[in-house]
Curated annotation (Swiss-Prot):
Catalyses which reaction(s): H2 + NAD(+) = NADH + H(+)
Protein name, entry field: NAD-reducing hydrogenase HoxS subunit delta
Gene from which this protein is expressed: hoxY
Source organism superkingdom: Bacteria
PANTHER family: COENZYME F420-REDUCING HYDROGENASE, GAMMA SUBUNIT (PTHR42845), HYDROGENASE SMALL SUBUNIT (PTHR42845:SF1)
């Protein structure tokens, strides 16, 4: 299979989200960034907002493409930087992460779940069938007398036997730890990358005591 050119989009046979031509014209010269949340709580995505007013000058240099903030489902064109929150816990997560890896020059794990699995990975010490039974059959919220079944349908993404950190599925270029990471850490990484500076997160940013 031919490797995609840097300006092409690999999308696992799914069409990229169409982009408004007027919006595309306004993005010329800006660095394209995409974000995605996999198996996590989305707290790391909210940390982007903790950059507060520092976002404004960044947006003069950055165009945010696929993101929970834009509701674009697929990356519409190749991106320079991709931020991934959450671990990998389903076949859909795997496909989404591979799509990001194929279409982002730099891919960054954001937060504990993406870096090492986080809280969702606590289920890794149990068999998947036991986790599903606890959630759907033995749950305290189960309706008495109702038939308890584990849902299965082709349209429901199949759950993986364990939760994986992102780097065990695809190559990740950088890691921003934290649960969630501080907005200062995300800002430093993005600001340094956008301005072509090497970066090294100081330990003070990642200390919580």
């Amino acid at each position: 299979m031919r490797a995609p050119h840097k300006d092409e989009i690999a999308s696992h046979e799914l069409p990229a989200t169409p982009m408004d031509p007027a919006l595309a014209a306004n993005r010329e010269g800006k660095i394209k960034v995409a974000t995605i949340g996999l198996c996590g709580c989305w707290g790391c995505t909210l940390s982007f907002l903790d950059m507060d007013e520092r976002l404004l000058p960044l947006l003069e240099k950055v165009t945010l493409l696929r993101s929970s903030l834009t509701d674009i489902k697929r990356i519409p064109e190749r991106c320079a930087i991709g931020f991934v929150e959450g671990g990998v816990s389903s076949e859909e997560n795997i496909e989404t992460l591979e799509h990001f890896r194929e279409n982002c020059d730099i891919l960054i794990s954001v937060g504990a779940c993406a870096v090492w699995g986080g809280v969702p990975a606590m289920r890794n010490v149990f068999e998947l069938k036991d986790c599903l039974a606890e959630a759907y059959v033995n749950s305290a919220t189960a309706v008495p007398g109702a038939k308890a079944v584990v849902p299965f349908h082709p349209d429901i993404p199949r759950i993986t036997t364990k939760v994986y950190p992102c780097h065990e599925v695809v190559k990740m270029d950088y890691f921003i730890p934290g649960c969630p990471p501080d907005g200062d850490a995300i800002f430093k990484v993005l600001d340094d990358l956008v301005n072509g500076r090497p970066f090294d997160l100081p330990s003070s940013i990642n200390r919580y005591d």
